[in-house]
């Protein structure tokens, strides 16, 4: 049997203990799902609804979201559907039952009003809070600003929503 030099044995021991410590202290990934209702003031108040699915690590999270801003042809308010992927930077722990976050992402969108439509891409930024209610159930408050590329009727949309969030 070949002997392992003393310096190598120390390195292997330190490496093994480091990997064991990191594995034992690693925070598990957390997922959540949100169903929401909200309002957009662009160009004037009208309803929005949608859902999101997210995965959070300690501070960084990822989210995929679908939202539908209803069209009102009588009031000449365009409809907007977005499919977005976002990165969240969030507080690692809840403070007084509240987890705060900031988000940025990119989306594909379709804006419609009657026969007119525009399909293109855009970006969004925003932030919000997830507030613990009972067990894994939380209320989510979210504000976003969407910047649409191409030739939309409105190049910037704002949105505020309140959602039911389930953490698992």
Predicted feature descriptions by range:
Residues 1-32:
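Cleavable N-terminal export/targeting peptides
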Residues 54-124, 131-135, 139, 160-168:
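Gram-negative (and chloroplast) outer-membrane scaffold detector with strong preference
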Residues 34-36, 109-111, 147:
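Extracytoplasmic loops and strand-loop junctions of Gram-negative outer membrane beta-barrel proteins
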Residues 40, 67, 146:
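Active-site beta-loop-alpha junctions enriched in small/polar residues
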Residues 39-49, 72-79, 113-118, 149-157:
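Solvent-exposed loop/turn segments connecting transmembrane beta-strands
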Residues 30-39, 100-104:
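Transmembrane beta-strand segments of Gram-negative outer membrane beta-barrel proteins
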